[in-house]
């Protein structure tokens, strides 16, 4: 606080009442800014009481990434932007479960619940982890919207089509295929593993035919190779419901 209240001038004479009042107002304004931690800066774009002012205030020790993550979570927004792993699948299931519990406690009717949004930009990943996230979405009473903002490849493709509503960015891309698997052990265990994997692939097929307009004939044609799609193609095949023209 740089200002002080002055009653006399440099010669020792009493200052006019108007000047004393201005001095009091300046001190009060300084004190008020210090209390809220929002001093004005030279940049006129940053208002003293704005959130940006608080975040950029050098006196505040704020981890921007941590703040962003917390705000996203409070906004019911999740990001699937890496390889899909079992650990991350548990995290997504927990967050979906959390908001269902909140809505249940608040007794909010399903049709009035604020949706959980999953933003997707992923190359895919573990098949079991993929199914875990798909099941969490399917079992959620609170609506879960999927928004493919970049890559909806492999496992991320199957998660994307699971949303109660499915959206895509204008330049989002999609890759449908059944992926690959590794198996080891002796011959008997190898055969068992192959049979079980075939069962999982059949589940992927049922999931795809249920949630898209991809026909069984087209599925069989592309399941062992790659079917690439633009956002427009994704609309055509019922992979997404809408191409976004603004951020949700």
Give the location of each predicted region.
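Terminal-region recognition feature
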Residues: 1-248
């Amino acid at each position: 606080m740089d200002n002080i209240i002055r009653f006399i001038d440099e010669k020792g004479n009493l200052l006019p009442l108007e000047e004393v009042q201005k001095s009091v107002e300046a001190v009060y304004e300084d004190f008020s800014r210090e209390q809220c931690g929002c001093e004005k800066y030279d940049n006129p774009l940053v208002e003293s009481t704005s959130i940006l002012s608080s975040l950029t205030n050098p006196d505040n020790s704020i981890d921007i990434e941590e703040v962003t993550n917390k705000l996203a979570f409070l906004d019911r927004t999740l990001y699937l932007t890496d390889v899909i792993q079992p650990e991350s699948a548990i995290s997504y299931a927990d967050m979906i479960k959390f908001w269902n519990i909140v809505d249940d406690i608040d007794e909010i009717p399903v049709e009035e619940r604020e949706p959980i949004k999953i933003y997707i930009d992923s190359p895919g990943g573990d098949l079991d982890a993929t199914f875990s996230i798909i099941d969490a979405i399917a079992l959620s009473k609170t609506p879960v919207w999927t928004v493919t903002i970049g890559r909806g490849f492999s496992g991320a493709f199957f998660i994307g089509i699971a949303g109660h509503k499915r959206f895509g960015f204008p330049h989002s891309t999609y890759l449908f295929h059944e992926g690959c698997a590794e198996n080891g052990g002796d011959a008997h265990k190898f055969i068992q593993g192959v049979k079980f994997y075939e069962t999982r692939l059949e589940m992927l097929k049922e999931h795809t035919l249920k949630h898209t307009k991809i026909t069984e004939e087209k599925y069989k044609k592309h399941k062992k190779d790659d079917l690439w799609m633009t956002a427009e193609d994704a609309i055509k095949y019922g992979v997404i419901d809408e191409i976004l023209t603004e951020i949700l």
